[in-house]
């Protein structure tokens, strides 16, 4: 698989979309976390308390979560989702493996550039 580099950032509301080469778009969102009965824990969108700065996962939805505090002490939950993968031309869509984000995400796989030149 070719290495892709970030070429553009586009911020919309609280979500950040990153455009990668070869039709891969990633999305990441941040929302204010709920207050847990234990003030040292963040109330995640799963309804459970989580320690600050530790990741937890939803493997069924292929998501990664993280709670953090801003400079004012407000807790936020960061949610990382799989990129939107679009296979164009000679590229194919390869399903992700089972397990935690990002390994469970689909990927766009393209033939190496030198292989394309040989076919011409």
Swiss-Prot record:
Keyword list, A-Z: Disulfide bond, Secreted, Signal, Toxin
Signal peptide region? 1-26
Nuclease recorded as keyword: no
Q: Which GO terms describe its cellular component?
A: extracellular region
The record's listing under InterPro entries reads:
SVWC_dom (IPR029277)
PTM note: Contains 4 disulfide bonds.
Tissue/organ expression: Expressed by the venom gland.
Subcellular location(s) of the protein? Secreted
Superkingdom as given in the UniProt entry = Eukaryota
A GO term for molecular function: toxin activity
Query: What family is this?
Result: Belongs to the scoloptoxin-16 family.
**Record-given protein name:** U-scoloptoxin(16)-Er2a
Write down the species.
Ethmostigmus rubripes
Its taxonomic path starts at:
Eukaryota, Metazoa, Ecdysozoa, Arthropoda, Myriapoda
